[in-house]
Amino acid sequence: MIPKEVKGRDINWHTPFGPVIMETQISDELHNILLTRADQLRNGTHPNPNINTETNDYRTRLAGCLSEEYSYRGAFTEEEDAFVEAELTFLAAHYTLAAHKASKVKENAVRDANQIIMQKPLWVNYMKSGEWNPSHSHTGKISCVTYLRVPKEIDEENQRGEHTKESNTPSAGRIEWSFGNVGMPYSSGGYIRTPVEKSIFFFPAALSHMVYPFKADTERVSMSVNFDDRIDLEQALKQDGERGKKEKL
């Protein structure tokens, strides 16, 4: 029996399950602020004499198995701080719109930038050969990671390294998010991306993710921060009791 032609039929596909990951780029100005201040903090040339690699060591607060992770606390001028927050909360708000367009949340979950709270401080990771970030999640509602310095040697390792070039999943230095049932037919439980300089990813803070180590004798620099939802927090403060009865206004 010859199957009937598809022409004339309505065929639709849906992706109703799983989270949304948004990828875009940061501005040149934001990139310059984040990388310059991080490098100054690290090499002891930061204009703020009260911060250094000891005062801003952030490793005990993070899951990463890295030798250098620093917070940006005290690293920005007031003008820089306002610029950083404005751009990142704008992008985080756009993430809520993207989630709505992907039919993951209702329209009343879309937020403006002033309804997004950035959880300070931001932090920077200097990732070196053999270091990694184990599977973990973050606090808040939304998380992001952006890449400030990405050496070409890491991508070359995936293409030409003896340990990676024949693999069907070359993953040196790559980031992977995981969700749901791995191995289910017609489904994917993981999403792997290759970091690119100035690229930034937004995703649910509770979404598990990890970063694979690389062997190349080089160093990659990334920045992360989390965000909360001002509307949700205000509503939570108005609730009481086990059933979350809302306070009458």
Locations of regions flagged by a protein language model:
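Catalytic core of non-heme Fe(II) oxygenases with the double-stranded beta-helix
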Residues: 117-200, 219, 229, 236
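Non-heme Fe(II)/2-oxoglutarate
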Residues: 1-112, 123, 129-133, 171
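A short beta-turn/loop motif at secondary-structure boundaries
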Residues: 112-116, 215-217
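Beta-strand secondary-structure signal
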Residues: 23, 143-145, 222-224
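Ligand-binding loop in jelly-roll beta-barrel domains
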Residues: 212-222
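Histidine-centered metal-chelating micro-motifs
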Residues: 131-132, 206-210
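Double-stranded beta-helix
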Residues: 178, 226-249
